[in-house]
Amino acid sequence: MKKKFSLIAMAGAALLLLTACGTTAVTSSSTNLWDQIVYGFAQVIRFLSFGGLTGVGIILFTIVIRAALLPLMNIQIKSSQRMQEIQPEIKKIQAKYPSKDMESRRLMNEEIQKLYAENKVNPYMGCLPLVVQMPVLWALYQALSRVDFLKHGTFLWFEIGAKDPTFILPILAAVFTFLSSYLMMKSAPERNAMTTSMTYIMPIFILIMGVNFAAGIALYWVISNAFQVFQTMLLANPYKIIAAREAKVQVEKDKIKAREKALKKARKK
């Protein structure tokens, strides 16, 4: 979660940097490679803008991107679930090496890496979907600020290339970010202070960025995080995971009771 927050902070800083670096209009005659990519994104959104509604184009564009990432997200979710399940084992290994000297740290890391390999866990997989989305977000921001037909497009109550005057989109983006993080946290067998704090900090960070960036970017975050909530409920429903975990624990308890009952009967004979 901390790595994810750091990546989002980097994305925000990159957006600010791009704002300063690229300010000239992008057209079909632009020769710079990055400008051509930006214009290509703009053309895709334009193609998806049914009825000339740029907002519809951004919504459909976001859904297409998220749908394309589904296989990767599915792998990430399964890896995260396995990571959550082995947390008790990781804590045992950490308790085994309380010393902070280099040799103890090396041995501890070796055991943890071995545990990861045995359970097919990649601790960096959770950040991969976000890393893939970062260039998309940067290109979208540039398209909204440098391509005229997107910059001056309107949808519902807001202008695509300007800030949302009502703050509705930034608030919705923050709400869906919270729901997404909360659902992922809810299924964890154990919760730590860092995960809990990031669940509340990240929505605030998204809210601040949503207020300061173009409404089109905030709309992208709203749809992207709403899709994430839907995806979590579909692929990693925390309520089903908790129910399955409790059922597994109950089965183990029933086995223990059955063994104890069998032992009592054997003693009576």
Curated annotation (Swiss-Prot):
Q: Which domain of life is it from?
A: Bacteria
Task: Drop me one GO molecular function for this one.
Answer: membrane insertase activity
- Annotated InterPro entries: YidC/ALB3/OXA1/COX18, YidC/Oxa/ALB_C, YidC/YidC1/YidC2_Firmicutes, YidC_ALB_C
A family per Pfam:
60KD_IMP
Lipidated sites in chain (S-diacylglycerol cysteine):
C21
| Predominant subcellular localization, coarse grouping | membrane
Q: Which family is this protein grouped under?
A: Belongs to the OXA1/ALB3/YidC family. Type 2 subfamily.
Location in the cell = Cell membrane
- Signal peptide region: 1-20
Keywords associated with the record: Cell membrane, Chaperone, Lipoprotein, Membrane, Palmitate, Protein transport, Signal, Transmembrane, Transmembrane helix, Transport
- Covalently attached lipid (N-palmitoyl cysteine), positions: C21
What is known about what this protein does?
A: Required for the insertion and/or proper folding and/or complex formation of integral membrane proteins into the membrane. Involved in integration of membrane proteins that insert both dependently and independently of the Sec translocase complex, as well as at least some lipoproteins.
User: Mind telling me which residue stretches traverse the membrane in this protein?
Assistant: 45-65, 124-144, 165-185, 203-223
GO CC annotation: plasma membrane
Q: Does the keyword Thylakoid apply?
A: no
Membrane topology qualifier:
Multi-pass membrane protein
The molecule here is called Membrane protein insertase YidC 1
Q: Name one GO biological process term.
A: protein transport
